[in-house]
């Protein structure tokens, strides 16, 4: 693959049309490997001898934040210098010059900042439900499996298995195992197809690492935050939610929260992080494993604005859908509230609707006479929880369990920043809304009938 990647870089210097395989903005291991393996395969099988260029959808400077990516590249002997990052290729200029064909892998929807590139998208390969209300006007292959690398492996082995070398097989094999939590049936992340293609890769290359060995190594590398600054730790796996001008960062922190709170200069680091990125609040979701290898989840809410902080904390403490079962942890600052999260099944994805409710409650309080906020929350809390539960269920109806985070630390998922159904708040439970949701579910299910290019 090294020679191929050198050819890709050389192609960037030529004035010629380019085929780009673009991973998602999280650039997790699945996204990186899927882009590399699919582009390599398409280049090898191109009848016109076109070159397909894999592009990692982050800046080169951000790669060190993804420890499992860095570790695996070293493990399979691919030099970081050979890779092409988003800040090293001007996709917009290529598109405006009519020289860009884009293939999306491990995502199916471009962020608003890339809206101008939509016309260049020729194919989509993803493993999560279609969020748009229409089938993109291109070849679309979407299947709900644990890892997009599974779909890439399927594409290769069904199309031209003779092109698969051990290096690419090792990349796909390790990625599927990490994404599917070592194929553990109790976790429920791996589908039959994930298991099928892991077994096929192992049959073709019997010297691939043992599953437990590669899973343990990748997971250790993924959650290794030693040497990272506070800002790097917060940016390593971060989502952002907005609500009428209020902006909240939601970051996964892969260590014991109590140890995190003892970091030197932490409060000034948190303040600088929020100020530099214009966040009104920061929610840190800590997760680590105890001595019994059981997941432990903790929460910290940092917010200098007392009203916003109290509203977020109040909604989280009172939430029953889901019930977080929070126990306060002694705080190091009046601007920070920390908790032990008793319900470890509540992942970030499941917490986001609750945080959206908190932002709505805060914004409502800005329009509510002083002293009435608590009464408003308390008076309708039970009803509000029921309505939130119904609304959340209506939002995820039609999605498979595969799209939910596992009860272990998840790999970074596609960004929820842009075009998320929750960005505009929870829907009103009217007859029209129910009808609209049913229509969306039907469209989502019908995407299986869209043409795919295998």
Swiss-Prot record:
Keywords: Acetylation, Cell junction, Cytoplasm, Hydrolase, Manganese, Metal-binding, Nucleus, Phosphoprotein. It comes from Rattus norvegicus (Rat). Mn(2+) 1 binds at residues 28, 106. This is Exopolyphosphatase PRUNE1. GO terms for biological process: regulation of microtubule polymerization; regulation of neurogenesis. The gene is Prune1. Residues 398-421 are annotated as: Disordered. Its EC number is 3.6.1.1. The modification N-acetylmethionine is found at residue 1. It catalyses: diphosphate + H2O = 2 phosphate + H(+). The lineage of its organism: Eukaryota, Metazoa, Chordata, Craniata, Vertebrata. The modification Phosphothreonine is found at residue 411. Its cofactor is Mn(2+). One of its GO terms (molecular function) is inorganic diphosphate phosphatase activity. Activated by magnesium ions and inhibited by manganese ions. Inhibited by dipyridamole, moderately sensitive to IBMX and inhibited by vinpocetine. Binds 2 manganese ions per subunit. It comes from the Eukaryota.
């Amino acid at each position: 693959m090294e020679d191929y990647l050198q050819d890709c870089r050389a192609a960037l210097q030529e004035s010629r049309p380019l085929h780009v395989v673009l991973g998602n903005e999280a650039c997790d291991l699945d996204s990186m490997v899927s882009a590399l393996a699919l582009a390599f395969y398409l280049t090898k099988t191109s009848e016109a001898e076109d070159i397909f260029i894999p592009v990692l959808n982050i800046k080169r400077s951000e790669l060190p934040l993804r420890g499992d990516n860095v570790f695996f590249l070293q493990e399979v002997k691919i030099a970081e210098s050979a890779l092409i990052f988003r800040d090293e290729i001007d996709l917009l200029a290529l598109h405006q010059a009519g020289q860009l064909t884009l293939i999306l892998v491990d995502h199916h929807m471009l962020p608003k900042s890339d809206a101008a590139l939509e016309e260049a998208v020729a194919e989509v390969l993803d493993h999560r439900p279609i969020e748009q209300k229409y089938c993109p006007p291109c070849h679309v292959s979407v299947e709900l499996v644990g890892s997009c690398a599974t779909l890439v492996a399927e594409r290769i082995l069904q199309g031209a298995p003779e092109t698969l070398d051990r290096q690419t097989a090792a990349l796909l094999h390790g990625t599927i195992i990490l994404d599917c939590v070592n194929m553990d049936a109790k976790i429920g992340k791996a589908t039959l197809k994930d298991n099928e293609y892991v077994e096929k890769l192992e049959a073709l290359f019997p010297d691939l690492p043992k599953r437990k060995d590669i899973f343990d190594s990748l997971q250790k590398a993924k959650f290794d935050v030693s040497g990272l600054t506070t800002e790097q730790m917060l940016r390593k796996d971060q989502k952002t939610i907005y609500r009428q001008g209020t902006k909240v960062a939601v970051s996964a922190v892969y260590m014991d929260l109590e140890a995190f709170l003892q970091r030197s200069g932490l409060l000034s680091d948190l303040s600088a992080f929020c100020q530099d990125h214009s966040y009104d609040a920061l929610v840190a979701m800590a997760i680590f494993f105890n001595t019994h290898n059981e997941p432990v989840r903790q929460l910290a809410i940092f917010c200098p604005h007392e009203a916003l902080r109290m509203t977020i904390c109040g909604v989280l403490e009172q939430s029953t859908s889901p019930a977080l079962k929070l126990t306060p942890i002694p705080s190091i600052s009046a601007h920070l509230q920390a908790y032990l999260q008793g319900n470890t099944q509540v992942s970030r994805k499941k917490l986001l609707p609750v945080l959206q409710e908190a932002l709505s409650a805060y914004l409502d309080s800005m329009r509510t006479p002083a002293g009435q906020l608590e009464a408003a929350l308390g008076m309708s809390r039970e009803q509000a929880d029921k309505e939130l539960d119904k609304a959340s269920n209506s939002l995820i109806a039609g999605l498979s369990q595969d799209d939910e985070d596992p009860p272990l630390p998840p790999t970074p998922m596609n960004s929820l920043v842009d075009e998320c159904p929750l960005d505009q708040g929870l829907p009103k439970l009217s007859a029209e809304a129910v009808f609209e949701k049913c229509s969306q579910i039907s469209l989502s299910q019908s995407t299986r009938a869209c043409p795919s290019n295998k």
